[in-house]
């Protein structure tokens, strides 16, 4: 009924990503899955419609991939050793991968602290091997987090350079004004670009 959609609205207005009750294992709580069932189904369908012509992830730098949240079957192919999941609204089965969840609302720009946390997690997960950073489409939330890592690791000198790196790999990346403002706010502590631009080392 309509009240279920109102719960989604409350998440955006009051509760934030926590309202989806996504746990550290990647699954939404049973209560959230029941309360939000129509919205969750719509989110899955929307993700499929937007990415059906290009479902595959793209390698931004060696060992670092950007894409939509994969299905269990897609994760089982062994391409990745680690997954950073930026969705709040979609459940995920990590399939034994090194997994971290950083739930973010769709259509809402991450804040600076989200971006800093993501950069730490990306460094941590890259040590495990090939890493996929994912959101529902792989175009905005996850792209913003990877851009933040590029900036904070010195692999990009400024926001436009970071966006250019992303779009060379994944042309559909879309970072709006709000996302760019967040990334620009990181610039005060961004180091000089690395001499080894583009190189990602694994432990």
Stretch-by-stretch model annotation:
Residues 197-203:
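Long, low-complexity, intrinsically disordered segments
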Residues 132-145:
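Cytochrome P450 heme-iron axial ligand motif
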Residues 1-51:
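N-terminal membrane-anchoring alpha-helices
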Residues 20, 71, 142:
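Short, electropositive, low-hydrophobicity segments enriched in small/polar residues
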Residues 44-133, 149-186:
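Cysteine-based protein phosphatase catalytic domain of the PTP/DSP
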């Amino acid at each position: 009924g309509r009240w279920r959609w109102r719960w989604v609205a409350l998440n955006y207005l009051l509760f934030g990503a926590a309202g989806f009750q996504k746990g550290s294992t990647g699954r939404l709580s049973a209560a959230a899955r029941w309360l939000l069932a129509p919205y969750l189904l719509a989110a899955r369908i929307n993700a499929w419609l937007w990415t059906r012509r290009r479902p595959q992830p793209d390698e931004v730098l060696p060992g670092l991939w950007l894409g939509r949240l994969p299905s269990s079957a897609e994760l089982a192919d062994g391409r990745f050793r680690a997954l950073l999941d930026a969705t709040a609204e979609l459940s995920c089965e990590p399939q034994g991968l090194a997994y971290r969840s950083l739930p973010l609302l769709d259509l809402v720009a991450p804040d600076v602290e989200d971006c800093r946390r993501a950069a730490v997690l990306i460094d941590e997960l890259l040590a495990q091997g090939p890493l996929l950073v994912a959101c529902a489409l792989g175009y905005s939330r996850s792209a913003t987090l990877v851009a933040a890592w590029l900036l904070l690791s010195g692999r990009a000198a400024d926001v436009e350079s970071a966006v250019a790196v992303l779009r060379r790999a994944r042309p559909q990346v879309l970072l709006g004004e709000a996302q760019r403002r967040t990334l620009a706010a990181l610039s005060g502590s961004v180091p000089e670009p690395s001499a080894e631009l583009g190189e990602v080392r694994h432990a």
